[in-house]
Amino acid sequence: MSNQMTDSTSAGSGTEHSVDTNTALKAGSPNDLKVSHEEDLNDLEKTAEETLQQKPAKEYIFVSLCCVMVAFGGFVFGWDTGTISGFVNQTDFLRRFGQEKADGSHYLSNVRTGLIVSIFNIGCAVGGIVLSNIGDRWGRRIGLITVIIIYVIGIIIQIASVDKWYQYFIGRIISGLGVGGITVLSPMLISETAPKHLRGTLVSCYQLMITFGIFLGYCTNYGTKNYSNSVQWRVPLGLCFAWAIFMVLGMMFVPESARFLVETDQIEEARKSLAKTNKVSIDDPVVKYELLKIQSSIELEKAAGNASWGELITGKPSMFRRTLMGIMIQSLQQLTGDNYFFYYGTTIFQSVGMDDSFETSIVLGIVNFASTFFALYTVDHFGRRNCLLYGCVGMVACYVVYASVGVTRLWPDGPDHPDISSKGAGNCMIVFACFYIFCFATTWAPIAYVVISESYPLRVKGKAMAIASASNWIWGFLIGFFTPFITSAIHFYYGYVFMGCMVFAFFYVYFFVPETKGLTLEEVNEMYSEGVLPWKSSSWVPSSRRGAEYDVDALQHDDKPWYKAML
């Protein structure tokens, strides 16, 4: 990046003065950075920190509610996941979009099932890359409203489908485009709005809403399964209009991202946004300090010119590593195998002899939703790295039991092996499926979004998050499409495949994912600039908070062999 930048004039002030070397470094700026402000940055930082420490918890209610409203975008995604798993087993849906057997009953072939379930993910991948640009151009709020409208268009096409499966298929692609944009813009707006000490928890609310949507989707399927007509699936789809209207209305009360406003030179609006989210006046030291930090960071990024897609590979500091990390984390989140249960949970538990597999899916949904509340605590108390690592260990253990019981005691081709089939074994598998979902919901489910939302500088954030999210959707498509074929071929041995992925994920997180707990987005950038080793990153301290004896070199090198460094 360039070591020079132009003078910046702060709104509401006609004076300029230079910031000394230490102050410039604190702001993440080059030494000759000039800013417009009445107070020295050192004094502002001290005053702002004192103000924040004295703020009662109730002062964060408004910004928390705003972030929860934005996180409701996750509910839209979860609702689709929870309902589609039931649709593919409902009689009216099978009659309209399936194929007829010789006995007059209807079924969905593996190909058609895979396409209907998984094509949504392809739409999401494209929407995440293409439609998320609306947020960079017109703002995060306008971007979210736009993609919600696209989502509704897709829902209308699905509801209007009568007996042509490809019409329903097209509707799922279009609704996927909208949800793909939501999955990028929602965590992005939350991470840019939330106070740093609450950011992990509030970004995790996005995953909480996903689990809430999955749970209510399961419940709605259970409530409509006894109907014999299109009420079975059209009512759950029709409820999507209510969710869309609720979110659009909510966007009217959510302040725009201050970082976006500063980037588009709307300084006064940024000041108002910061004041609104912090529940203070626009002249408060907290607003002045946060605005100055954002300005200095963005001015530095603008000095290097507009970000290109190629900068995700060639950019500094460590942009290729950070881009690859986002792709890997989002890919591995899918390779945990969660959608194996969520997309096909009803089908799976039919195969193990459960009397009402819809009820079993509701149990999984309850565990998933309840566990995510625990994640709101763990993400900011145990750190991102530790949660991901512990999650890998827990899920590996669950898959060992789940798959081993499945391949030794249960056979999907039950009549061929009636002597070794066991309903008790099926119950055991459900228990460990619940343990697995607890491990997933408290670790990888929310933290994957937290990690990518706070790993990139603003200049490339939209593009980097879009690429990372696209990798998640592509793997979601592959798992959703091929799961019917794989389970038909290897049955419950499939669990060992996901177990192997989690073993790989453990080592990847340990060696390549740094700890970002408690850091501002600008401080994360500074950590990457200093080349801190990921397994030592939890000990890293930003330059603005270091003592005289702080040794950053010790965090950049490790003389121990890798296997000792892990212990």
From Swiss-Prot:
Protein name per Swiss-Prot or TrEMBL: Low-affinity glucose transporter
Compartment(s) of residence: Membrane
Alphabetized UniProt keyword annotations: Glycoprotein, Membrane, Sugar transport, Transmembrane, Transmembrane helix, Transport
Gene Ontology annotations for the cellular component aspect, listed alphabetically: plasma membrane
Domain of life: Eukaryota
Region (Disordered): 1-36
Matching NCBIfam families: SP
Residue spans of biased composition, Polar residues class: 1-24
InterPro entries xref list: MFS_dom (IPR020846), MFS_sugar_transport-like (IPR005828), MFS_Sugar_Transporters (IPR050360), MFS_trans_sf (IPR036259), Sugar/inositol_transpt (IPR003663), Sugar_transporter_CS (IPR005829)
GO MF term list: carbohydrate:proton symporter activity; D-glucose transmembrane transporter activity
Sequence ranges on the Cytoplasmic membrane side: 18-62, 135-141, 189-199, 256-334, 380-386, 451-466, 515-567
Glycan attachment residues as annotated in the record: N89
Function: Low-affinity glucose transporter.
PROSITE patterns the UniProt entry points to: MFS, SUGAR_TRANSPORT_1, SUGAR_TRANSPORT_2
Similarity field: Belongs to the major facilitator superfamily. Sugar transporter (TC 2.A.1.1) family.
Topological domains, Extracellular: 84-113, 163-167, 221-234, 355-358, 408-429, 488-493
